[in-house]
Design a protein with these regions (language model features):
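HIT superfamily nucleotide-processing domains
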Residues: 1-122
Length: 122
């Protein structure tokens, strides 16, 4: 299988990993729409929402709440959109949840290493 997210899970492709456990990996989006834009992906390959186990979905939502709190504490976000694409609009055919932060005053996109440092340190 030639899945970019499976390669990220296996560390064949580097990522700015914010959180990882036996079920999921959470990392910064390489092409962010805003500062702190991240993805949560299951380590097991599921193609889309129809394919994924409910227990894994529940775990992803649990981790999304933890990441929201982290984004609020470290990047001082003012809002958060969760996005999960399927079918025609799904670019990578491996289930993933986008966490896209919003800010009262729009900011320029910071260097990914700067965002990573703010989220991983302190």
């Amino acid at each position: 299988m030639d899945c970019i997210f499976c390669k990220i899970i296996k560390n064949e492709i580097p990522s700015y990993t914010i959180y990882e456990d036996e079920t999921v990996k959470c990392f910064l989006d390489a092409y962010p729409d805003s500062n702190g834009h991240m993805l949560i992906i299951p380590k097991k390959h599921y193609t889309n929402l129809d394919d994924i186990d409910i227990e894994v979905l529940n775990h992803i939502m649990k981790i999304s709440k933890q990441m929201k709190k982290l984004l609020e504490e470290r990047l001082h976000i003012d809002g958060l959109t969760l996005i999960q694409n399927n079918g025609l609009v799904q670019e990578v055919k491996h289930y993933h949840l986008h966490l896209k932060p919003h800010y009262q005053n729009e900011q320029e996109i910071m260097n990914i290493e700067e965002v990573y440092s703010k989220l991983k340190n302190n």
